[in-house]
Amino acid sequence: MAEEKSKSSAMDAFVKLEKVGEGTYGKVYRAMEKSTGKIVALKKTRLHEDEEGVPPTTLREVSLLRMLSRDPHVVRLLDVKQGQNKEGKTVLYLVFEYMDTDLKKYIRSFKQTGESIAPMNVKSLMYQLCKGVAFCHGHGVLHRDLKPHNLLMDRKTMMLKIADLGLARAYTLPIKKYTHEILTLWYRAPEVLLGATHYSPAVDMWSVACIFAELVTQKALFPGDSELQQLLHIFRLLGTPNEEIWPGVSTLVDWHEYPQWTAQPISSAVPGLDEKGLNLLSEMLHYEPSRRISAKKAMEHPYFDELDKSGL
C-alpha cells in the first residue's frame, strides 16, 4: 500500500502550469517543482492499453537521454517519476530542464517581421547544432527526426539544445535495418525517401542542412507535401541523381524513372548566405550519404572561423 501511495504522490512534487506540446509519445507540460520553485518541462508518456509496465521505447529513450544529457547541447533529463493516472495505470513522467522557445518559433518570429536572422546568430546556432549532433553520433545515436520544432532554445542566451530523442536509436556497426516511417518530410534525406533500409549518421546531416538553409531564408528548403513531391523538390535544386553521382541509387526500393533535372547553383535557393556557408551547405547535401560531411568535420569548417566558440 505504501508503494501505491508513493506512486500517486510522485507528481505532487510539481504544479502543472500549462500544456506546451505533444511529443511523439505523450504530452509535455511546463511545470514548477514545489520544493524549489524551479520551472521544468514534464513529459508524460502515454502507455498503450495493452501494456503492462513501461514501454521499451520509453525505457530506450530514458537510457539514451541519461547518457546524452551530459552534453550542453542535448536537453537535460533531470529526473524520472512514476505515477498513476485516474484509471490506475502506470504513467511515467520525464522531468527535463525547461527552455523558453524552439527554433521553429524563433524562425517564425523573424518571418513575421520580415527581418533576417543576423548571420552571426545563424553561425552560432549552426555550430551548436553540429556540436550536439556530433556528440550524439559519437555515442552511437542517430536522432533521425531533427527539425526546427525539436531544437529548443533559450532566447536570452541563444543556447540551442536537441530534444525529442523519441525516435533516436543507437546504431551499432554494421548498421541495422530501420523502419523508414520517420522524420518530418521536409528534413528527410533522399536515401530515406527512396526506401533505403540501412541508415548512417548522414541522415541527420541532411536534416541539419535543411535547417541551415531555413535559418538563412526563413523558408523551408524542400517543402514537399508527399514523399514523391519531396523528392522532386530535391531533384529540381540538386539535379536528378544517377548511378554516376550516387552509386547504387537505382537499386533502392522506391527508385523509379524520374524527370531529368540539371543541378542549379545552391546560392539560388539560399540567397544571402556567404561563400563559406554555401560551401558547407553543399558538403551537407551530397546525394551519396558516405560523401556527406560529418557533424564533427562540419565544426572545423572555415564557415565557423570567425565565431567566438567560448561558452558554446
Curated annotation (Swiss-Prot):
One GO-annotated biological process of the protein: cell division
Pfam families referenced in this protein's UniProt entry, alphabetically: Pkinase
InterPro entries hit by this protein: CDK, Kinase-like_dom_sf, Prot_kinase_dom, Protein_kinase_ATP_BS, Ser/Thr_kinase_AS
Signal sequence coordinates: none
Gene Ontology MF term list: ATP binding; cyclin binding; cyclin-dependent protein serine/threonine kinase activity; protein serine kinase activity; RNA polymerase II CTD heptapeptide repeat kinase activity
Active site: D145 (proton acceptor)
Positions of the Protein kinase domain: 14-304
Family designation: Belongs to the protein kinase superfamily. CMGC Ser/Thr protein kinase family. CDC2/CDKX subfamily.
Function: Plays a key role in the control of the eukaryotic cell cycle.
Descriptive protein name: Cell division control protein 2 homolog D
